[in-house]
Structure formats: structure tokens, C-alpha cells
Amino acid sequence: MARYTGPKSRIARKFGEGIFGADKVLSKKNYPPGQHGNSRKRKTSEYGIQLREKQKAKYTYGVLEKQFRNLFEKAATAKGITGEVLLQMLEGRLDNIVFRLGIAPTRAAARQLVGHKHITVDGQVVNIPSYAVKPGQLIGVRERSKSLEVIANSLAGFNHSKYAWLEWDEASKVGKLLHIPERADIPENIKEHLIVELYSK
């Protein structure tokens, strides 16, 4: 399955929440898209609920099925609660950290910046969006990329104290992953236990 590149509002309506950020369409059309979207909802099966939660997580973090499955398998063998470890791994992806630091306005934009070699880790260019950032590593903007409009606009007025597990130096345009976030600190509305139940079948 290829990464979804269609209207984000359509996906937001599918899940009934702005998984890509604030969505004005939801205030007007808070029901699923399609011909029968505004009709009475049918009861969803347990499997359907679990699958929906997995899809929500994949869309939120912009991860393909194979990548998501691989992350789950790693989380399942790691120390800790599988669902929480899975979310922590998703949060630790380079593209997500670039987004959380305010360098990019969306995760999709963050993936592009990483892929186009605008981002560095510990001073070295890294162009792999799924790169797993470790605590203590420095995430920065390549010198020649600091004047890019998308980066400047995204950083303007961004609240860098928003996430306690990240640190930002405005002068050097460098951020730092202080520690892996606890589940309670991750703001995404994802019921990870449903994903664990789905993969455990």
C-alpha cells in the first residue's frame, strides 16, 4: 500500500478528528466522507475497531504497513509495555522529531526535508525519515538550508517548550532529544492496546 497523498480533511473526517492538526472541515462535516457518510452509523466489529486504530496510527505518523509491522515486532520483543514502546518508537523517528521541534509544519513536510538532505544528526546529513534518534543526539538544519521559507515560517513563533523531552537552541537551529517521552506525554489520541490486540490475533 502506497503512502496516502490525497486530501487530509478526508482522512480526518474518516476518523472524526484532526489527526494531521486542526481541521476546519470537521466543524462543518463531522461525519465520514462518501455517499453514505452522514447516514446512521452501523455497529463496527471488534476487528474493525482494532483495524481502524492501526490505520489512524499509520496515517498520523505517515508510516507504511511494512514499516509499521516491523516496528511492532521490535516493540513486542523490547522491554516494557508493547503498545507504549510502539508509540515511543514512532515518536523517535527523525521525521517526527523534526516536526515536533517545529522545523516543519507537518510530518509530511518533515519527511520531505529529511529526504532532501536539509536535516543533520550530530552534524552529519541524514536523509532517512525512519532513522531512530537516540537520547542525547542533536538534530539540526543544514547550514545552506536555514534560509528556506518552509523552515523559517514553521519556526516563527513556535513554542519550543511544548514538549518536555526536546530542547531547542534558536541561534544554532539545533534541537536535542533529551529522553524518550513517557506515554502520558505523547499527545496523540491513539488507543495503542487495540493495535496490540489486532496483531496478537
UniProtKB/Swiss-Prot annotation:
One of the GO BP terms on file: translation
Description of how the protein assembles with itself and partners: Part of the 30S ribosomal subunit. Contacts protein S5. The interaction surface between S4 and S5 is involved in control of translational fidelity.
SMART domains, A to Z: Ribosomal_S4, S4
Pfam families (alphabetical): Ribosomal_S4 (PF00163), S4 (PF01479)
Descriptive protein name: Small ribosomal subunit protein uS4
Protein family (similarity comment): Belongs to the universal ribosomal protein uS4 family.
InterPro entries: Ribosomal_uS4 (IPR022801), Ribosomal_uS4_bac-type (IPR005709), Ribosomal_uS4_CS (IPR018079), Ribosomal_uS4_N (IPR001912), S4_RNA-bd (IPR002942), S4_RNA-bd_sf (IPR036986)
PROSITE patterns: RIBOSOMAL_S4 (PS00632), S4 (PS50889)
Region feature Disordered, mapped onto this chain: 28-47
Gene field: rpsD
Alphabetized NCBIfam families for the sequence: PRK05327.1, rpsD_bact
Organism of origin: Bacteroides fragilis (strain ATCC 25285 / DSM 2151 / CCUG 4856 / JCM 11019 / LMG 10263 / NCTC 9343 / Onslow / VPI 2553 / EN-2)
Functional note: One of the primary rRNA binding proteins, it binds directly to 16S rRNA where it nucleates assembly of the body of the 30S subunit.
Residue ranges occupied by any S4 RNA-binding domain in the UniProt entry: 92-155
Keywords of this entry: Ribonucleoprotein, Ribosomal protein, RNA-binding, rRNA-binding
One Gene Ontology term, aspect cellular component: small ribosomal subunit
SUPFAM superfamilies found in the cross-reference section: Alpha-L RNA-binding motif
GO molecular function: rRNA binding; structural constituent of ribosome
